[in-house]
Each structure stands twice: as C-alpha cells, then as structure tokens.
Amino acid sequence: MMPATRRSASVLVSARGSAARFPASSVSFLHKGAADVCRRFSASLSPFSCSAFVSPSCPMASSSPFSPPLFSSLVSSPSSPSAGFPRSASSSASSAPPCSSAGVSKVSCLKLSCGERQQEGEPSLPRSAEERKATNRRELECLRALQSAVAEREAEADGGWTTWRGVSQRTWKQKRPALLSSRVTAAMSLEEEDSTSGPRGYEEERERRSGVCGERGQNGGEKLGRVQGVSTGDSESRTRCRRGLHFSPQTNRSFVVLLSCLLFFLVGEVQEVCLPSLQRMESSTDFFFFKIASAEAHTANPGDSSKSRRRSPRSSRFTSKASSDSSSSSRSSADSSSSSRSSADSSSSSRSSADSSSSHPSSSSSSPLSSSPDSSPEEVNGLRGRARVWTRRGGLSSRLREFLSDASALRSQESAADAVEEARARVRLLSRFARSRRQTLEALGGKSRRSEWRRKRTGMMASEARESHRGRDLNTLADREKKALKSALLAAQLSRRRMQSIQSERSLYSLVRPLLDESDAAGVYTANECVAVRYADYPKEFPGYDISTESCRCPDGWLPCAESDAVARMSAWEPVIWEENADEGCTSERGEVMLEHMNFYSCPQRTFVEYTGPRDATIRDKQCKRVAFVLCRAATSSCITGPWSEWTSCSVPCGEGYQYRWRIPVTGASSSTDKGAVTQRSSREACAPYHMEERRKCNLGACPEKITKTTCFWTTVQVDRAEGAFDEDQGSCKCGTGDDAIDREEGAMVPCTPEEAVASMDNWKSHFRQHCYTSLGLRRRSNLALRFHSYGHVVRLGLRDLWHLDCTGGWSKFNIFEAKMFCGVGAKILCRSRTDSAQVPFSMEQHNAESDAVTRISMLLKRQRRVEEASPQAFAEESLLLSEGGVSHLWISLCAGAVAAVVFLVCLTKRAAVGTFLRSRVSTATAGGETVSAKGSTRGSRNAGRRVFSAQAVREAVEERVHAFVAFARRQTTAVILATEKWMETAAEREVTQEMQGVSTASLRLLERDCKEREERDSARKSCPQEAKGLLEGEEDVPALLVFPALKTATDRVVRVARSTLSLETRSFSGAQRSAQRLWGKVRSIFLARGKEKRDEDLFYGEEGERGRIQRGGPAAFVSSLACQKVERRRARRGRREGDSGEGGDCGEARKANSGVAGRLDSLTEMERDDSFVLSAVEEKLLFPRGKRNTQEKLARINKAARTAAVSAVTPESFGSM
C-alpha cells in the first residue's frame, strides 16, 4: 500500500480489457491517501483489492478519454510550457516519481503506460512477446504524438476555443469516436498477446473477472461489446499497474456510473472556476443587450419601471449582481486562470456585501453607535415633556425625490423620431457594441492569428468606409436619423458606463427606511407611562396623603405608579428628576420620588426602597408634603401616538454627545370619561404630559488636541461619478473641477475633517440649513423640524475620511460603497485650502474660529487669486452695501441737512438780530415813503391828499411786497421739497405709495377734496376779519411770520424725506389724532398687522363717514371752525404777553355750529393736545387712509384688537386638573 501522505493518486479499474484511470483529485480526494479511497468505496460496493496506483504524471493515465484534465494543470501559470498542452512520454517519464512498493516489482505494463525502462531483477518474457509489445508501444506513442499535433494545430486555428490540454471542443467532439476505437483496438491486441504468453491455470479466473465495457455515441446507438479480460498470470502479485479491484458485473456498472457523476460534477466546477466557457460568454453578451433594452424601456415609461421595481426588489438585486458578474469577468481578461479564480472570489464577496448593504441601507445611520439600546439610567438624559407639533408634508420634496430616484437626462427627450430610422440607428450602434464585445471575448482566451487578421481587415474596411463617406457627402444622415442615433447613443452610454452605479444606487435609495415609520403598517400605541408630578406646581393645600389609594395624592384621573410601571420606562421620568436637581443635587430631603403604597425611589442611591414607616395618616401626610415628586399614571389614557423612531446619529463627531428619537401624537379627537361625564379633547392635548422625544449619551471617540487653523467653505462636487469623483486617499469626494491646471490656478482644495468643520461652523452653517430646508421641503424654518424629520438623515454633507453630517445634526461615517454612491455632480462637501498648515488647540466647547464675514471673503478672494489685493472695506455685509446711485443721494442729503441745521441754529440763536435787521429794512422803506410825501407837500396844498395817499400806498406796497416774498418763499420751498422727495424716493417707498393708491378709488377723491378744503379755508379766512388784522398788529409777529414758517417747513421736509405728496403739511393735527398716533406707535409692532383686507375695510368705513358728513355740510363748518380757532389761539398768546385777558372772538358761532362733528376739541385734554409724536407717511396712510376722520372709532377698534391679541397669547402651562 502507498503511504497516506501522497496527495495525488490514480485509481486503476480493470474492466475486462479497458484500463480507465481516474485521478483521485477528480473524485474530491485531494488530501486523502489510497487507503481512505478504498475505505470509502468498500462501504457501498463489494469487497475488492486496492493496492496498485499509478502516478498522475503517467501520460497514459492523463490522456485517457475517460480521465478529465488535472486541476493543477488547469490553474497553472500560462507562462509554463506545460500549461495547456500534453506532455511527451519522455518528459513524463523523467518527471515521474519512482514507482516502488514493498515486494512489488515493475512489469511490462508500467513500461507501456509510464514509459519506464525494465530494471534489473525483473522477470523477462519470451522475445517474440517483447517484440510484439514494442510494436504496440510504438503505435500508441505515435497515436499520442498525432493527438498532440492535431491539438496544437487546432489551438492555433481556433484561438480561445481550447479547453483541456490544448484540445479544442470542436476537435474533441469530431475525433473522439476514432480515438476511442483506435485505443480499444490497441488495448485488445495488447491483451491478446499477453494472454497467449500467460500461464494456463488462470483461464477460469480470467473468465470470472471479465466485464462488460460499452461505448456510447452521441445518440446512444453504438453497440455493447464484451471484451475479454486481461490475465496477468504470475506477474499479478509482482506488479502495481495490473493489480485492480475485484468487481462483479453488477457492481461494475454502478461503480462506473458513480464515478461518471463525480467526473461530470468536477468538470462543471473546473469550467466555472478556471475559465468561462463560450456559452457563458454568450449569455453575458445577451444579458448586456437585455440591459440596454431595459434602459430604453425605462426611458419610454419611467413610472412603470419604478413601480415594477418597487413590486419586485429581488429582480433589481439580481440585475445588479449579474451586471457585477459581467463587469468582473471583463476586468479579468488579462489575468491567468489562478488570478481569475481569486477575482471571482473577490467579486462574489463584494456582491454579497453589496446585497447586505442594499438590504439594510440605513444600518449605519440607525445603529446606536457606542450606546446600547438598553442603556443604563445614568446614560439617558431626556428632554422636558412637551408635545412638539409642527407641520409636516405628506411626501418628499421634488429635489429629494429626484435625488432618491434614478432620474436621468433621458426623460426630457422627445419621442418624435421616426420608428424605422430610430431602429436603423439602434441596429448600427448595437452592432458596434457587438463587435467590441466579441473582441473582448477573444481577448479572454488569448490572441490568435485569425483574430489579428480579422482586426486588421476590420480596420481597413472602416478606413475605406470613412474615405468613401468623405468623398460622398459629409451629411449623409437625415435630421430624424441623427436624433434617433443620438438617443440610442445616450441609452447605450447609460447602460455601458452607469448601469452598475444606477442599479446600486437604486438598491440603496429606492427603499430608504425613514427614521420614523409613518405608514399604516407602523401601528398606533396608547401612551400610559409614569409621569413625574412636581408638587411645587400646585397650591400648598394640594400635596398630601390620599387615604383611598394609601399613597401620596395624584391629580384627578391619575393614579400612583407601582414599582413595575416605573422600572418599565425610567427614561420617561428620571431625566426630569435629574434636571430639577442639577444645581443642588439629590439629597435625602428632596431626592425622594414617591410611588404606590408610600414606596419611593431614592435619588442619591438610585434604587427603589420599600416603605416601612408608620401607618398613621397624619405622619404620612407630612411626609408627602415634604417630597418633591410623585410618579403618577393616567387611569384611562387617551394619548394615541405612533411608534418610536430610530436613534439619530451622534450630535458631535468626537467627545460626548447625544442621540435623539421621537414619536408623534396621532391627530384626532379622543373622548375620556371623568366621573360619568364624557370629555372630548384632541390627542395632542392628552399627550402633553408625556415625553415625545428622548435622548441618550453617545461617544465617537476622543477629540484631537490640535487641528489645522483654516476655514472650511461650502462647495459643490463638479466631477461626475463615472469619472472618479471619489478620492481614495482623502476618503471623500474630490474638491474642485477635476482639472489639475484649473485647480492649481484657482487654489488647491482638500476636504475638511469634522473637527475643522466644527471650528469654522459660522462660515457654512447658514448654507447647510438652507440646503436642508430646500431638499426636505420645509416651509417652517425651525431647527426642531430638521432634527425630528423622518428623512433628515438622507440629506448629507460630505467630509474627509468617510465622515458626513446629516440634517438631523448627526455625525457618522459612510461605508466605502455608500461614499462612492454619494460622490457625484451636485453633492455638497466642505473644502479648505491645501496650503494651510498652522496647528491650533481644539476643544468642542470653545473654538477660535474667525466669524468676521469681511475677513473670510477677503481671504477667499486672495486664495483664489481673483484680485490682486482685497480690501476689507470693499466686501462689507450685504446689508451695508448701497444701491445703485445711493452714494450721490446720501451726500446730497447730508449736505442739505447740514445747511438747514446751520440756518436753523443761526436763526434760533440770533433771533433778535434777525428781527432788528428785518425791522430796519421795513422802517427804511417807511421812512423813504414819508420823505417822498414831505417833499410833495411843499408843492401845494391841493396835492396834500394825493401825498398822504402816496405815503399810505408806499406802506401798503411794502407790506404787499413782504407778503409776496413770504408767499413766494413758501411756494419755492414747497416745490424744492417735493422735487427732492420725488428724486430721493426709493423703490420700496414707491411700491408702498402705489399700493396705497391702488387700494381704493379714494385716492382720486382725495385730490378733489384737498382742492375743496383749500377753497373753503380761503373763504373762512376772508370771513374772519381778525386774521388780517392780527398779522400786522404787533411788531413781534413780523419776524416769526417772515422766518419761522418757511424754515420750520423746510426742516420738517428734510428730516422726513419719506413723506409722500399726500402728507399733512397744509392741515393741522387735532388732539385726538395725536393721541391716536401715540397709541399706534405703541401697538403697531405687536398687535396690529393689517393686510389688504383690513385696509380696504377701513377705507370703506372712512368713505361712508366722509359721505355722511358731506351730506350734513360738515367739512365746510369743520374747516372754518379750525381756521378761526387758530387765529384765536394766536391772539390769546399775544394778549397774554401784553397783559390782556383775551376774550372770545368772532369764531364762537362757528365753534357752536361745529359742536356736533365727531372728534370735537372741547372734550380733549391737554395731554391729548401734545404734538411731539410724529408718524411716518406709511404709518399715517395705514392709520388714517381717509384723513383725520372717525378717530374715536379707530381707537376703539385698535383697543379691541389689542385686547384680543393679548388674550389669545396667554396659554395655560399647568399640568393636570385640580
């Protein structure tokens, strides 16, 4: 027997004349010895001897038609000379190990099969027999040489069709019957010769050991022949090749069938692992074209394809797996068979990892990181129990839906191309791909002369075709055909370059699992947890002992919690205890939380303690009043919520942070029975005492001591995913355009680390929030809405070393597959300058980030070399930048204001000098008139009346000139002010003016009313003779008349440049109107935000009141009364200065006639007459769109609105009912 350490052996099966040697490796006994083979076969077959084995290097054994190729020859290096061709007899004999065994010598069969020479000590046969055996041996060697030559010739001709030892499949199928018949004939002749020279005593044994050997053709029509067995005679005990297994005719057939099955199984494994067959390549080609057809079908109707994908996710996974198989086989074209086996193993492992990642797409985001789900109470730190309510959209936004789906540029194409021309263009394109695919398949098996000649011929034909096309016409295709060819090219390019990435992205994002499952299958739950009731929130008489429950008192409808209820959900109430005792800590006086039957939770010890104190109700009442909290639960809970969400990622990239989860109350009314009465209230109100969000501690590792001092900038990835947007060295997306020259010119950028991003958060956080709001479709700009969004973890911001930040505020890491899928055109990433190298200390609480926007923009422009020198003053905040033409307006306004202020101050301080100057000018004019009259008196008395009249005429002329000058100054000042206001009016003021004028048709009536009021005022002044008399009655009134009215008007106009042409410069303010203005200034920013509907309502009421007063004749009497009262007040002031009592004038009748007008002055106090408060033009238009009418009614409406707003702003925050 051979030693058990031999790894390669061949089992000899003697089947009456045919020697079929099966290598032990072909029956999966690669590491077993011969004894183990015998034991395995002896268990199922009849006993037989297994003592002779032939080395696998024997050419007869390896070249037998029943023996498959050795596994070592198939996986050997292609550079070795024996990798694909049969070895000769001499080389096989030289390399064969010595065939030696205890007491067994070599015989002539080993010489024939293994090519070994006869050694000394062996028995010699008669010379005639040796000659015949030598002749047969030469014939067999010639047959082997012929087989090798045919195999080499067929390998050179068929290039890529070779299978076993250089013999092609086609040649093997054609030559197999002839080779089998020739070998059987040679074996039979050899056995006949041996039988004639053998001893006679073994004929019965020969007949007993005879077997049936049958050969099958393709259709199973060949005959079965009975072959005479080989008799070995006395040499059977001395040989190793002829000693075989003892078989019966029944076991012989079953053994052959068993080994044939093992042989076919091994051949299939070898073909699949080592070298793909032609049929497998053709199936891959068909699958490639199937992907193109599926991409075109998706282009024609993307909705149906997405629906079918959602129905059967297994098909998409199978497609992605098959595409990865084809891509891996094409990539391994230049490798050897051993390397192809390793690549197949690696591709299979990558497919399994891809399938696992696609089946669990959000496993990284939903994992609890460093915290376990059942964390200890000290690790859990919750929020205060309030029901967070915000408006959520039912679906995703359009941008996020496009990001998650496999949308492409093919959707926007029109399907207007002709069907025939489109098919023709597609056939052309697919034939081109078929040629390239065929070249790839030929390259897998090696290049041959035929493939090279075919490639040269194809190149020559292509060049000739191009030259012929140039000679004919440059535009040979029609427009429709060009359009069809372009669409087919895009479809093929999509399937060729991005099919695998799209399939992977589809499997990753099409079944994105939200953090909170809001579907109908998620279910609803009734929240009935223990709530920490704080006695400090209730009156002093409420805390105490309840005899009915034998526990501390809970609010109505609530019961004390048992220890089991409290332990079940400690995270619902323990954070409240720790938050309350955060400053002073838990002590024995105030650190006890009462439970059912006076049991309590000890906050210092963090354990539940059973009560063993006295049972007296008075003592227990005192004990209950000293505690801070009582755990209570609802007797009948009406709080209906959804399920808890998954935990978010950690809130910080390093150090100690928090993870969050939440649940949402179900919207709808619920009923609860309280002492027989049914109370209807919403589920959100019922869930107010419970925690709707919880948090727990997490830690992703220690923070670095130092980081690079730099600034991270918000950038967008500009490199396509197919062009390699992922940077393997940085572990993130590529910053920049992807062009090295442009990136060097603009400034090389690299991704930021999480610590660098935290240090410069002020530079990019506003962009990140805006990106989250836009992607998630949130109208309400709230940080809580981002943190507790179900798809907030999908929108991400890329960082270095596979880090990313999502919209929930969580920091986590990609796996390599997710990172490559994330990096593409449009992805957001934080980048910094590559040249920054200074190191600064880092801490999560305090960072030395530069928050100055001017400095950041200046540094950015310097780094990108867009300007030579960036001035900080030139890049101020957007709110400080002036609009176009604003600089000139500002300078002119400043100059005009300065001049007006100087003139005003001079007139105010030098009032006496200015008055003296003006009086001297008037006196000089009067004296000149008197001189002229004196000279005229000397001419005669008859002209005396004329001289007196002349002096009076001169004085009247001077007075008229003064009045004319004052009126002219007023008109010019008003015109200048109006022109300045119109010139300096901004676009916003013009919009307000147009809006107010376009609200109603009242603006047209206002102009007519102003003209009427001006005419009525002039007529009222004519009817009041005291007005003209009072203007020139005192000398002190002259300078005030000349200077102060125009100067005051000009100063007011310069200060209030925003006043429009409808301002109140020609009308006076009443006391009620001034009080309304003061009230408006106090409440307008809080309570009154009137829209267009409110303004229309006020305008309507104002028009109705105006129409009623016009019918009663009110405006004329009201205006005349105001004009007379103004003159009376001026005369009263002058009388007080002169010591006069100042009796009533001629305007008493007008005052009495106007006593019925609304807003009369008699009922106003001195405080209401204060005119120090001034409104802007926009506020005046909002408050008084129709002038100064109905003031008291408007005040009443404003006060009512203020009270309503104050009442609605108060919301009860107490818990429970008394």
Swiss-Prot record:
Main location: membrane
PROSITE patterns per UniProt: TSP1
Compositional bias annotation for Basic and acidic residues: 201-210
GO cellular component entries: membrane
Disruption phenotype: Conditional knockout results in reduction in the area of lytic plaques due to inability of the parasites to invade the host cells. Loss of rhoptries discharge. No significant effects on parasite replication, stimulated egress and attachment to host cells. No significant effects on morphology and localization of rhoptry and microneme structures. No significant effects on microneme secretion.
This protein's record includes keyword 4Fe-4S: no
Transmembrane segments annotated in the record for this chain: 886-906
Described function: Required for rhoptry secretion. Plays a role in host cell invasion.
UniProt keyword Transmembrane, yes or no: yes
Subcellular location: Membrane
Protein name stated in the entry: Thrombospondin type 1 domain-containing protein
Ranges of biased composition (kind: Low complexity): 315-375
Keywords from the named record: Membrane, Transmembrane, Transmembrane helix
Complexes and interactors: Component of a complex, at least composed of cysteine repeat modular protein A (CRMPa), cysteine repeat modular protein B (CRMPb), micronemal protein 15 (MIC15) and thrombospondin type 1 domain-containing protein (TSP1).
Lineage, opening ranks: Eukaryota, Sar, Alveolata, Apicomplexa, Conoidasida
Membrane-protein topology: Single-pass membrane protein
Domain TSP type-1: 638-704
Region of interest called Disordered, as start-end residue ranges on this chain: 82-101, 189-240, 298-383, 445-471, 1129-1153
Biological source species: Toxoplasma gondii
Gene3D superfamilies for this protein: Thrombospondin type-1 (TSP1) repeat
